[in-house]
């Protein structure tokens, strides 16, 4: 099951390329072509009322310009001199007793794509030296991410406005190294999804399948998950971000095994995320109603993928997915009226309440999406990506159809909207819970490159679920 962890991109993480990209974006935004970029890594934090450390997660913007995963680190980038420096913690003899020797300055210089490595004790002196040599010009930093002991007093100008935006906009377009990391995260995660398929018919509880997924990822080199995995059986799949993952797969009241398991899970590989969703029948074969909904969602995704290329408006792709959902639900008799009227009335939102997808990278919901959560149109309110797709951007494509009583009941009871839903036909589909299919794709000038290899054809999923 394990995948060789040696299949990684050659060379160092391209921190210098990223620093230059951010500096160029700062200039494009009208903030000059010189100065110091200053960023701090995440600090070590202790669990409240305890001497134990909290789980560590490096600040993504810091990692983007350094490739350094070490806590309590700093960086500077001299834009004019094109000099990238990281500052790492020095040896603390008391810590060595418990944790061993930390990375040395010499080792760090070999590992990271930087020009210099210094001790964190030298940050202020280094900033002062820059000001003395360059006449005390500008420093770019992120507000509320500067430690109290750091001083910018020697600088003539402190810019807290542009750096965060410049880094986050630069992160949208991935270079080949980043895409290789994302592809690796997808390969490992896809294998883990297959392991879950094969265990689906024998598992007794949601947590068993989560354990199989996480274990498969860890054995292949991914110690962290991109987000809390979602293992939602039966009607739990109607909750978009179900978190419990701890219910039995046989209903305690009816004694019946639940129909399906929705698995939304992805591993994090060297700080880059996979975000994949699949649905597997817990009996080994989709029920007729489950298969009908699955086929609609698969068509929603295929229609969306066919539209993807650089420059396409994501809102248009999202709208197409809604129309495919409407046509499918009309065919089943769940909806009634015309496609256009149902689309204009927003009836499909009752069954497809979230956005079609989002940018993906070091964060699951990655930067640069420009969502508008104040949008009054419910079809677009939760769309985390707006505007034209960028070539080199990585997006998730994750349509779904859900049968959530909390969401659908207000439509059914509405004098204006209830007439569009056939409650008698709908009754047959509540037990399906929800179906979502999610892939991660790189946007290209002419189309897309799908990074996700987990099977999604229903026949193949059924075969794997019943394979001995």
Curated annotation (Swiss-Prot):
Domain of life of the organism encoding this protein: Eukaryota
Enzyme Commission code: 3.4.11.9
Sites where the protein binds Mn(2+) 1: 275, 398, 438
One GO biological process term: proteolysis
GO molecular function: manganese ion binding; metalloaminopeptidase activity
Record-annotated membrane-spanning stretches: none
Signal peptide as annotated in the record: none
Reaction catalysed by this enzyme: Release of any N-terminal amino acid, including proline, that is linked to proline, even from a dipeptide or tripeptide
Cofactor requirement: Mn(2+)
UniProt remark on cofactor binding: Binds 2 manganese ions per subunit.
Broad enzyme group: hydrolase
Residues annotated as binding Mn(2+) 2: 264, 275, 438
One Pfam entry name: Peptidase_M24
Keywords per UniProt: Aminopeptidase, Hydrolase, Manganese, Metal-binding, Metalloprotease, Protease
Listed PANTHER family: XAA-PRO AMINOPEPTIDASE 3, XAA-PRO DIPEPTIDASE
Role played: Catalyzes the removal of a penultimate prolyl residue from the N-termini of peptides.
Family listed: Belongs to the peptidase M24B family.
Protein name, as recorded: Probable Xaa-Pro aminopeptidase PEPP
Gene symbol of the encoding locus: PEPP
